From Swiss-Prot:
Signal peptide start and end residues: 1-25
Keywords assigned: Disulfide bond, Glycoprotein, Immunity, Immunoglobulin domain, Innate immunity, Secreted, Signal
InterPro entries referenced in this protein's UniProt entry, alphabetically: Ig-like_dom (IPR007110), Ig-like_dom_sf (IPR036179), Ig-like_fold (IPR013783), Ig_sub (IPR003599), Ig_V-set (IPR013106), Immune_rcpt_domain (IPR052314)
Location within or outside the cell: Secreted
A GO MF label: signaling receptor activity
SS bonds (residue pairs): 40-109
Protein name, UniProt field: Trem-like transcript 4 protein
Glycosylated residues (UniProt): 93
Organism: Homo sapiens (Human)
Function field: Positively regulates Toll-like receptor TLR7 signaling in macrophages.
One Pfam family matching this protein: V-set
Span of domain Ig-like V-type: 26-126
CDD domains: IgV_pIgR_like
Any GO CC annotation of this UniProt entry: extracellular region
Length: 200
């Protein structure tokens, strides 16, 4: 069964589908656990209500019906598929929740003619469900509060605190000139005082 301008194929339960020739699937990308929200538009027509369907392609010429609307303005849910038709607005919504990688594949949404078992495809969807890309953990250094340090300097030295809790010290070399005592003892004492000043 065929007619001008459309391609006809049969799918599961002996139902046929038709869509414009050369139609390219729209590729949609999702991650596991996410929800697919899809809108299919059509031209509203007067007369008896025409059900709308969402099906998954199983071969180039076959498709399995997943969910079909029964009346307007009423949501129909089957498994993790939901369809809701709004004839006055000229579109119906498809929802797929809790996606898994097994949901990847080709889908069609369209107008379903139950008496002739024909669905007129409105959109051809290629759904790709893949794991979210992994990212390297971000390492941060712990925050170190600025500390204030009280420095007690021995006589002859002075301490000057600086930012970030570090300290800058200035020391004066002890006066090693003196007239009293042996020269050796004076040199030893001067060395000890100088070493102590550097350690502080």
């Amino acid at each position: 069964m065929a007619w001008g301008g459309v391609h006809t194929c049969c799918f599961h339960l002996c139902c046929c589908c038709s869509w414009p020739q050369g139609a390219v699937p729209e590729e949609l990308h999702k991650h596991p656990g996410q929800t697919l929200l899809l809108q299919c538009q059509y031209s509203p027509k007067r007369g008896p209500y025409q059900p709308k369907s969402w099906c998954q392609q199983t071969s180039p010429s076959r498709c399995t019906l997943l969910v079909t609307s029964s009346k307007p303005w009423t949501a129909v849910q089957k498994s993790h598929y939901t369809i809701w038709d709004k004839p006055n607005a000229g579109f119906f919504n498809i929802t797929m929740i809790q996606l898994t990688q097994n949901d990847s594949g080709f889908y069609w949404c369209g107008i379903y003619n139950a008496s002739e078992n024909i669905i007129t495809v409105l959109r051809n969807i290629s759904l790709v469900v893949s794991p979210a890309p992994t990212t390297s953990p971000m390492w941060t250094l712990p925050w170190l509060p600025t500390s204030t340090v009280l420095i007690t300097s021995p006589e002859g030295t002075s301490g000057h605190p600086s930012i970030n809790g570090s300290e800058t010290r200035k020391s004066r070399a002890p006066a090693c000139l003196g007239s009293g005592g042996p020269r050796f003892l004076v040199l030893v004492l001067c060395g000890l005082l100088l070493a102590k000043g550097l350690m502080l």
